[in-house]
């Protein structure tokens, strides 16, 4: 008689995905971030659901309802801060996950990679709309500034902005629709994650060497289930330390002031995980140019499979490319720092240089260095 997990129509899908899945024997801790992102998504949906039970999407009561959650709801403060800091953890893991993909050449799985980039856009949209919901000063002005960027689109721009706002400014209609989208998007993301995994399981996982590992596979369970659980444990320790000791460390103090359309905060800036893109946006003095640079800074990820010019898949055995990879990481950290600084000298110049360097490394230095390495290896 066949084992139920191998014969049951539903359980066998789980079995082929998480239990009997043949996995490379040498994947490192960099391959833990996929499962950590899955746990983060589950945690965000769960905490978000409980927050939605007490939140009211109305301009007059939104701010008060968040205060009510923190003060009066049983463990409301815990749920709220787990949700807010969970988003930060989500993005840390996302960036590590993408960085891993770039370093080890995982982008050669083009279907998996492209749906991953779309997932990144969906998560960024969800996080942006979630930041608007507490209806603090930074929520309101962040929403105003970012939605206003669409007015740079020729011809249809201004109409499009008013259509998204549901009026002539960010108001009640905007908040209500942002709540609706913020609620539904995580479920769409979950469906996209399933497609992401479907494409991944068509090819099997990549590994640090970048070589085919069909000759050396091990079952996912128990080897990688236990490894994932260890990763989840570390994640929960980090998250709960953040939530319990410094819950507002990554937030903006301005968001503890209720939204006021008549008073602009001195420095409008998004959450830390968008600062690199915000710095690129601000570095171009033209509105449309800035918006294009902003979109391209993320969309450029889709070019990685096309720009790959090395005969080797991974960067594991390519020291020059490794140097460039870490230059790119340092560059992104500089952009993140600049995004949080006021628009004044010398930050403007640093931001412009870092923005140019970002595109220069990806579009020119990385492919040309890969070609040079091929030559050095007489390939």
Swiss-Prot record:
Binding locations of heme b b562: 83, 182
Keywords assigned: Electron transport, Heme, Iron, Membrane, Metal-binding, Mitochondrion, Mitochondrion inner membrane, Respiratory chain, Transmembrane, Transmembrane helix, Transport, Ubiquinone
Domain of life according to the entry: Eukaryota
TM regions (residue ranges): 33-53, 77-98, 113-133, 178-198, 226-246, 288-308, 320-340, 347-367
Binding site for heme b b566: 97, 196
Gene Ontology BP, a term: mitochondrial electron transport, ubiquinol to cytochrome c
Subcellular location: Mitochondrion inner membrane
A GO CC term assigned to this protein in UniProt: mitochondrial inner membrane
Keyword Transmembrane among UniProt keywords: yes
Family: Belongs to the cytochrome b family.
Protein name: Cytochrome b
């Amino acid at each position: 008689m066949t084992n139920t997990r191998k014969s049951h129509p539903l359980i066998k899908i789980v079995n082929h995905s998480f239990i009997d899945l043949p996995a490379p024997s040498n994947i490192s801790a960099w391959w833990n971030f996929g499962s950590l992102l899955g746990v983060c998504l589950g945690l965000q949906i769960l905490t978000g659901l409980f927050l939605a039970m007490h939140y009211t999407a109305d301009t007059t009561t939104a701010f008060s309802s968040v205060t009510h959650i923190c003060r009066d709801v049983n463990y409301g403060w815990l749920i709220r801060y787990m949700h807010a800091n969970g988003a930060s953890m989500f993005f840390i893991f996302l960036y590590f996950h993408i960085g891993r993909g770039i370093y080890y050449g995982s982008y050669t799985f083009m279907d998996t990679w492209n749906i991953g980039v779309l997932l990144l856009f969906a998560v960024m949209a969800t996080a942006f709309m979630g930041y608007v919901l507490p209806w603090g000063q930074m929520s309101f002005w962040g929403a105003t500034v970012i939605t206003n960027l669409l007015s740079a689109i020729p011809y249809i721009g201004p109409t499009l902005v008013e259509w998204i706002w549901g009026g002539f400014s960010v108001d009640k209609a905007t908040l209500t629709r942002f709540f609706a989208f913020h609620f539904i998007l995580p479920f769409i993301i979950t469906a996209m994650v399933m497609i992401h995994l479907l494409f991944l399981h068509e090819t099997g996982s990549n590994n640090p060497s970048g070589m085919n590992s069909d000759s050396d596979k091990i079952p996912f369970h128990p080897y990688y289930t236990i490894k994932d659980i260890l990763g989840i444990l570390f994640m929960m320790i980090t998250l709960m330390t953040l939530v319990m000791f410094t819950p507002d460390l990554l937030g903006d103090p301005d968001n503890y002031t209720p939204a006021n359309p008549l008073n602009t905060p001195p420095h409008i800036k998004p959450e830390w995980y968008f600062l690199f893109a915000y710095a690129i946006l601000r570095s171009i003095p033209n509105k449309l140019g800035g918006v294009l640079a902003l979109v391209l800074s993320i969309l450029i990820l889709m070019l990685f499979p096309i720009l790959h010019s090395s005969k080797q898949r991974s960067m594991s055995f390519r020291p020059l490319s490794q140097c460039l990879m870490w230059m790119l990481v340092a560059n992104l950290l500089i952009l993140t720092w600049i995004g949080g600084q006021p628009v004044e000298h010398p930050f403007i110049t640093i931001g412009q240089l870092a923005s140019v360097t970002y595109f220069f490394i990806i579009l020119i230095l990385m492919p040309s260095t890969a070609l040079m390495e091929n030559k050095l290896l007489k390939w």
